[in-house]
Amino acid sequence: MAKATKKAEAKTVTIEQIGSPIRRPDVQQRTLIGLGLNKMHRRRTLEDTPSVRGMIRAVQHLVRVVDEK
């Protein structure tokens, strides 16, 4: 008998940039670029991993979590 396999859906988090990286430390600017954000009010849907959560926490004053699935 064949086993029914279900692909585990990866959890995702959608973030939006709400703050400007101008006059911010270089490490914060690079973190935003690492998250795929570089212009105001852009949104990205990323896989919800500990590394992504850490990056969001590092720039939490510049981004907003829109949706978590």
From Swiss-Prot:
Top-rank taxon: Bacteria
Entry's family note: Belongs to the universal ribosomal protein uL30 family.
InterPro entries assigned: Ribo_uL30_ferredoxin-like_sf, Ribosomal_uL30_bac-type, Ribosomal_uL30_ferredoxin-like
Example GO molecular function: structural constituent of ribosome
Pfam families: Ribosomal_L30 (PF00327)
Entry's Gene Ontology cellular component terms: cytosolic large ribosomal subunit
Organism name: Rhizobium leguminosarum bv. trifolii (strain WSM2304)
Ribosomal protein found in the keyword field: yes
UniProt protein name: Large ribosomal subunit protein uL30
GO BP, sorted A to Z: translation
Subunit structure: Part of the 50S ribosomal subunit.
Keywords: Ribonucleoprotein, Ribosomal protein
The keyword Lipid metabolism is assigned to this record: no
